[in-house]
Amino acid sequence: MLDIQLLRTQIDAVAAALAARGANFDAAAFQSMENERKTLQTRTQDLQARRNTLSKQIGVLKSRGEDASAAMAEVGGIGDELKANEQALATLLERINAFVAGLPNLPHDSVPPGRDESANVEIARWGTPREFDFEVSDHVDIGSGLGGLDFETAAKISGSRFALMRDGLARLHRALAQFMLDVHTREHGYTEVHVPYLVNPDSMFGTGQLPKFEAELFSVMKDDGRFYLIPTAEVPITNIVRNELLAHDVLPLKFVGHTPCFRSEAGSYGRDTRGMIRQHQFDKVELVRIEHPDASWAALEELTGHAEAILRKLELPYRKVVLCTGDMGFSAAKTYDLEVWLPAQKTYREISSCSCTGAFQARRMQARFRNTQGKNELVHTLNGSGLAVGRTLVAVLENYQQADGSVVVPKVLVPWMGGIEVLEPRG
């Protein structure tokens, strides 16, 4: 959530930054609500001052034995107007807060301008795509040939955009997630957390999914309210610090969690309908950091490097891009995407998105720390995929496929596969 004082004092600069994101910001509507707020507050203050003056006069009149009925009647009228103003102001502040809650984060100064993904800037590549001496297959055909990837049964059970995995492929999927968790906890210093997959509306608001993106979420209604299936572990993990006041010396907090993620994929009709690239349910290992404001931008570079380390250990070619202003997520101030090479598509596809949100989520969550001067200050929050497990599986299948339909297990994964070095096609 943006700082409302920034909107009040630097509205032109905010409008320009939001325009660079392609966000719809009605400055006139905000100014109108602000003018109404100021008028109400000024009138309320005037009435309170008049009531205080009259109360003193009533005391003097009564002490003299004089008639105070007129002054008392005026005080009663003021009380009625104050009550009406209080209700009107509360309603107006709700409108203002809802308006501000619908505005995305402001881009960091280092973010390149642009309207869409075509303006994203590649800043690095790692690895050389493998040259095949046979016609490559995509992950769907490879997985089916291994007898481990079954979309037909998944569709019978649930519908489109679901996958069922069996045997060696299911084990490889599990091994990837465990490998990622072990690297991030043992080598990168993250604390593993196991979190709920259903969260309340306050949690979704805190990380920025609500109210703007409700159509993209799955939810269930129970007697004690509505719960949402998490679209990413960023939601429950980041909300660990909602409404918390932390000591400055506990920062940074570094969390990692492995969860399924659930997305309706509203607006993606017809895109990536084949295979596991775009699913309603998929697994992800998520990195979340709670940082001191002075350390958050360096932390973004480090967090992104931790996600890159997984790709390098798996020896998967990838590229790193910084997203332009028009392609960033709602809560992000700056985002790096990591895109892995998929031989069957002959292109790089997103496998990780790493973002710093600054104080944007912290303000929505009221996540604060007490600084060295003893003052309360908002933390900064960061998140990133480390990595999307299903897409990593896709990349392994396609990059490690062999001419006979088998798939070589990446060397680094063999211990997590119980010594299995090759997945053989079914006979």
Swiss-Prot record:
**What subcellular locations does the record give?**
Cytoplasm
Q: What is its main location?
A: cytoplasm
The record lists L-serine as bound by T232, A233, E234, E286, S385
Q: Hey, which pathway is this one from? A: Aminoacyl-tRNA biosynthesis; selenocysteinyl-tRNA(Sec) biosynthesis; L-seryl-tRNA(Sec) from L-serine and tRNA(Sec): step 1/1
GO biological process assignments: selenocysteine biosynthetic process; seryl-tRNA aminoacylation
Kindly list the GO CC terms recorded for this protein: cytoplasm
This protein's record includes keyword Ligase: yes
Is Cell cycle one of the keywords UniProt gives this record?
A: no
According to the lineage, what is the superkingdom? Bacteria
Q: Which UniProt keywords apply?
A: Aminoacyl-tRNA synthetase, ATP-binding, Cytoplasm, Ligase, Nucleotide-binding, Protein biosynthesis
Tell me a Gene Ontology molecular-function term this record carries.
Answer: serine-tRNA ligase activity
Give the protein's function: Catalyzes the attachment of serine to tRNA(Ser). Is also able to aminoacylate tRNA(Sec) with serine, to form the misacylated tRNA L-seryl-tRNA(Sec), which will be further converted into selenocysteinyl-tRNA(Sec).
- Cite the HAMAP family for this sequence: Ser_tRNA_synth_type1
The family classification in the record reads: Belongs to the class-II aminoacyl-tRNA synthetase family. Type-1 seryl-tRNA synthetase subfamily.
Q: Which NCBIfam families match?
A: serS
What is this protein's record name?
Serine--tRNA ligase
UniProt lists the gene as serS
